[in-house]
């Protein structure tokens, strides 16, 4: 075999490994300054349905097959400044392994103020659907998949006291989700209002009753409609997970990963409601 043939064969043998090397990113998301692992951080291609969530130790693995070097790779987490990379840069930096450092976020004073002199009332808003005659299943259990409902409050300041999720059927031994509260802009979900992450864990036995999340420790005040959503941050495994549902109960909002565009599904509402304290 001459030198030219030998070189060609070596290149052909190396090609599959080089291609595989560039198709997957691996790394660890840590806190800048402390090196502490950041669990359940969001990693994804901005504006596209390609993403994942870091595990309990901050490790992540993301398939980037078919993505452009000009795409934006975004790392984000509640309580931290988001970090963007051009995918071409990240492809080189994280093809083997890398540490991604996120900086803690500083929050200003809340913009929504509730007048203590005004008379207040407690309201249940959203879809407080207890009947399981109609259900809506979760067809996508991708890490980072998010689903929820828009809560209307008629443009009066309100304090969120409790979130309730009504589950029609759950065959998973344990479900672990992250609760998100998004403001709205032009009738679409906007910024996440939470300053610290809120996780919800329950067993299939506990799912037979409404899942209630006490929001009083978080002091979340809203001025306008807001989206309540739940996000898959741990693998669910095999099984079924259905929420109660009802016709003409607003739309289901969902996105496949944290960086994907929000989409809506028809006039079928899912059993997510909120208890709020609002000015009369």
Locate each region found by the language model:
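Beta-sheet-rich sandwich/jelly-roll-like modules and their strand-loop junctions
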Residues: 107-184, 225, 231-280
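A short, solvent-exposed loop/turn motif at the edges and junctions
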Residues: 72-87
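Structural motif
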Residues: 23-38
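Extracellular beta-sheet/turn segments enriched in Thr/Pro/Gly and aliphatic residues
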Residues: 90-116
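Short, acidic Ser/Thr/Gly-rich low-complexity loop/linker segments typical of extracellular
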Residues: 49-59
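Short Pro-Gly-centered beta-turn/loop motif in secreted/extracellular proteins
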Residues: 61-71, 218-223
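Hydrophobic beta-strand segments
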Residues: 35, 41-45, 58, 73, ...
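Short strand-edge motifs at loop-to-beta-strand transitions and within beta-strands
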Residues: 60-62, 96-98, 209-213
């Amino acid at each position: 075999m001459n030198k030219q043939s030998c070189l060609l064969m070596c290149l052909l043998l190396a090609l599959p490994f080089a291609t595989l090397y560039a198709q997957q990113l691996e790394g660890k998301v840590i806190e800048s300054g402390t090196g502490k692992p950041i669990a359940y951080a969001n990693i994804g291609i901005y504006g596209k349905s390609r993403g994942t969530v870091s595990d309990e130790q901050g490790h992540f693995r993301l398939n980037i097959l078919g993505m452009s070097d000009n795409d934006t790779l975004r790392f984000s987490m509640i309580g931290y400044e988001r970090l963007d990379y051009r995918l071409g840069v990240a492809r080189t930096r994280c093809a083997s392994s890398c540490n991604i450092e996120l900086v803690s976020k500083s929050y200003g004073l809340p913009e929504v103020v509730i007048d203590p002199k005004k008379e207040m009332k407690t309201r249940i808003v959203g879809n407080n659907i207890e009947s399981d005659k109609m259900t809506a299943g979760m067809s996508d259990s991708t890490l980072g998949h998010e689903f929820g409902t828009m809560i209307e409050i008629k443009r009066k300041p309100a304090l969120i006291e409790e979130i309730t999720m009504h589950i029609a059927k759950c065959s998973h031994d344990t479900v672990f989700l992250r609760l998100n509260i998004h403001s709205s802009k032009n009738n679409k979900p906007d910024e996440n209002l939470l300053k610290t992450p809120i996780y919800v864990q329950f067993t299939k036995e506990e799912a037979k009753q409404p899942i209630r999340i006490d929001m009083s420790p978080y002091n979340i005040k809203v001025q306008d409609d807001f989206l309540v959503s739940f996000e898959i941050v741990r693998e669910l495994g095999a099984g079924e997970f259905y929420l109660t549902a009802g016709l003409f109960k607003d739309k289901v909002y969902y996105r496949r990963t944290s960086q994907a565009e929000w989409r809506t599904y028809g006039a079928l509402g899912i059993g997510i409601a909120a208890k709020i304290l609002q000015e009369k």
